[in-house]
Amino acid sequence: MPTLYLIPTPLADGTAPQVLPPTITEVVAATDAYFVENLRTARRFITELKTGRVIDETTIHLLDKDTPQADTRKQIQELMERKRNAGVMSEAGCPGVAAPGAVVVGMAHKLGWKVVPLVGPSSILLALMASGLNGQSFVFHGYLPIDRNDRGRALRFMEKEAQQRLQTQIFMETPYRNNQLMGDIIAQCQPETRMCVVCNITAPDAFVQTKTIREWKSQLPDLHKKPTVFLLL
């Protein structure tokens, strides 16, 4: 049976040599079919690894939140018939974790493929590691509601869960709305609630700090258009 490789990609530009093990390059060199979240970034990543692989001779299928499952099912079945291995890549970080990928992995399991996750950076786990908050019990909520009232209710719910369960609450926002979310957190959460802000993780200008809401209120960072993970406890 073919193998489906789950291939992490860098979180920050120019950091591949620092954050990816040699196995990634070896697998990419030997794999000529991919399911990817973003065609442009995937092609660039494959090229930057300098494996000698010719992009025009590589099969690359788009797999984002809008991709019909019927298309993906047909594509993976065709690869299986030809006994071709495949890789899955998200735009940044680990595929299938807060990123597309789970659909094709589920299909691969049903078809009897071997599924191999490779080691690489995850912004969620790196943020949790760096936060100093509870790493034994935590939950990732993904993106919060856009509507301000709904977002406020979500924040109050997470704060209550954090207090009652002593459970770290992890979430994120589209980078251009980070500052707005930061303001909503300050407005909705209690002064002594702790929050960790992890911004541009693995980049040279990475920012990681854990403070109480009271402390954050006196000095808000500028997170506009910067990939950021938020953690509450």
Language-model regions: role of each:
Residues 2-5, 84-85, 164-233:
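A contiguous loop/helix-start segment that scaffolds small-molecule binding in enzyme catalytic cores
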Residues 64, 72-113:
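Glycine/small-residue-rich loop that forms an oxyanion/phosphate-binding "nest" at active or ligand-binding sites
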Residues 11-13, 91-95, 175-176, 203:
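Short glycine-rich anion-binding loops that position phosphate/pyrophosphate groups of nucleotides
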Residues 40-42, 93-94, 123, 177:
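Alpha-helix capping/helix-boundary segments
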Residues 1-63:
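Glycine-rich, flexible N-terminal cofactor/catalytic loop recognition
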Residues 5, 103-161:
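Class I SAM-dependent methyltransferase SAM-binding "motif I" and its flanking Rossmann-like core
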Residues 28-34, 112-116, 168-169:
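Short active-site oxyanion
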Residues 61-68, 144-148:
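Conserved helicase motor
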